[in-house]
Design a protein with these regions (language model features):
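Short linear capping/connector segments at secondary-structure termini
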Residues: 202-209
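C-terminal ends of transmembrane alpha-helices
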Residues: 72-79, 193-201
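Aromatic-rich carbohydrate-recognition surfaces in CAZymes
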Residues: 14-37, 89-198, 214-232
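Accessory structured domains or lobes within enzymes
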Residues: 58-62, 66-68, 197-200, 216, ...
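Acidic/polar, glycine-enriched structural segments that form the non-catalytic walls/loops
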Residues: 1-92
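Carbohydrate-active enzyme catalytic cores, enriched for enzymes
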Residues: 232-246
Length: 246
């Protein structure tokens, strides 16, 4: 098993059905080596070409480093309901997934969903019980709930809403948001009440301690509210769209 997930032992994704041995994996790797490596080289060339056009040689080299560092930091699994899960060893925090998300939004938005799925589950199962997302869900190898301590209500609610809206934009539909609409609405309501003046809250720079009336945090909250309004608009929820966009 790779991780304990709210009482369920998860297998690594390559052996999610429990029927694949490491010897089978080695055999498949040998058989598919040439085909897989050709795809890898083609992807590398495309990534470098896109990054070079966007910002030149140095930017492209930074993108290559960032891609490898980000992808190697995650591991993938699947729960008993077939829900894809994408974890870092700290299992969150959302404010670390947020800056990584543009990479996955471009190449595979399903992996951004897989980052958010555990947070939606934790909120919707009743295990969390707060009107904003948890900061984290535990640490490897146990995903049992927030352990780091110190909620980041505006930070994480804003991140969750913005990431969900970004998924909808990339997929050109809001079906993922619709699936979690009740939870997203709860987060948006929290931001509407607390997002413009954030009081005395932690931000992603939590080493600095609480930051009263933090301007950047307010901006995150406002963008989260706007993200919810855009999702409501995509789902033809006109009243909600007008309320949160105004």
């Amino acid at each position: 098993y790779t991780m304990a997930y709210f009482g369920e032992d998860l297998r690594p994704y390559w052996n999610k059905d429990g029927k694949t041995s490491i010897e089978d994996l080695y055999a498949d790797a040998e058989e598919d080596y040439k085909e897989v490596m050709a795809k890898c080289y083609a992807f590398d060339r495309q990534l470098m070409a896109d990054a070079y056009l966007a910002g030149g040689k140095e930017y492209a080299e930074l993108c290559a480093l960032a891609y490898r560092q980000s992808v190697s930091a995650f591991q993938m699994s699947e729960d008993s309901e077939g829900e894809l899960l994408y974890f870092t060893p700290q299992v969150g925090p959302v404010d670390e997934y947020y800056p990584a998300s543009p990479l996955y939004l471009r190449y595979n938005p399903d992996l951004v969903k897989a980052m958010l799925n555990p947070f939606f589950y934790y909120s919707e199962s009743g295990k969390w019980g707060k009107p904003f997302p948890p900061h984290d869900l535990g640490g490897y190898p146990a995903v049992n709930g927030q352990t780091i301590g110190g909620d980041m209500p505006v930070e994480e609610a804003g991140n969750g809403l913005i990431m969900t809206a970004a998924i909808a934009k990339m997929e050109k539909n809001a079906s993922y948001a619709e699936k979690h609409w009740k939870t997203l609405t709860q987060w948006a309501e929290y931001l509407l009440e607390n997002g413009t003046d954030t009081g005395d809250q932690l931000t992603t720079d939590n080493f600095a301690g609480n930051c009263p009336h933090h301007t950047n945090l307010s901006a995150k909250g406002i963008l989260g509210i706007a993200a919810y309004a855009r999702l409501a608009e995509m789902l033809n929820k006109k009243e909600e769209a007008e309320k949160y966009m105004d």
